[in-house]
Amino acid sequence: LETMPSGIELVDEFISHEGGVPCSTNIMVIGDPGVGKTSILLDTLSSIEKSGRKCLFISGEMGRKQMFKYTKRFKQFGCVTTLFLSDFLEFNSKDVVEQVLSKGFDCVLIDSIAEIVDSVRDDNRWDRKTAESWLVDTCVKNNKGENVEEKFTSFLLIQQVTKAGDFVGSNKLKHMTDAMLEMRKESDRDGGGTYLEFTKNRKMLY
C-alpha cells in the first residue's frame, strides 16, 4: 500500500510499517481539547505537502484570525492550503466542502468532525445522524478516487471526546475509520508528557 511520508521520522514510523500515512485511508485522532491534536496533525500535513503531495486543511474550529496567531508560533502551518468554513457562512457548508474536495487531494485534515457535522446539519435542517452519514459518504467517495484528479484521498479526522473520555459519534463513523489514535496528556505528577496510542488499528497499521 502506497504511503505518504511526512519526513517526521517518529510520526511516520508510528503510523505505518512503510512509514507515513497510507493512501486511501481514514485515521481518526481523539482526545481532550487543548491536548495538541491540531498542532501535531497540521505539522504532519504541512510536511506531507512539502514533499509534493496535494493537501488540504478544512477548519471548522479556527478562523483566519486565529490561524494567523497560530502561524506566528508555527510558521510552517501558513503554507498549508486551508478551507476556513467561517469564510463561507452565507453559503451551504455541505456544498462548499463537496465543491472543494471534488478537485482532488492526496491528504485532507478535518478539524473537527463535530464542527463540520453541526454546520452541515444546521445549513440543511438535517438531524445529526444524516449529517454524519453525509460526511462518512463524502470521505469514502474520495477514498475511492471519485474526484477530478482521481486521487485516492486519505483523511486525518479530529474528534473531541466526552468528559469521561469516550468517543463521540455513530458506529457508522467509527467503522469507516481504518485507525483510531487516542491522544492524552499525563498529569504533572506523572511527568506531564503527551502520548499517542492506537485504540483501533485495521488494515495497514502494525
Range-by-range predicted roles:
Residues L1-F77:
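The Walker A/P-loop phosphate-binding site
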Residues G7-L10, I40, G63, N92, ...:
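Helical mechanochemical/support elements of P-loop NTPase systems and associated helical scaffolds
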Residues V11, I27-V29, C55-I58, T82, ...:
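Hydrophobic beta-strand residues in large extracellular and virion-surface proteins
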Residues H17, V96, S170:
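Acidic, amphipathic alpha-helical patches
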Residues D32, S51-W134, K141, K151:
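Conserved inter-motif catalytic segment of the P-loop NTP-binding fold
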Residues V35, L89-E90, V161-A164:
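Short beta->alpha connector loops
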Residues D137-Y206:
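Phosphate-binding/switch region of NTP-binding enzymes
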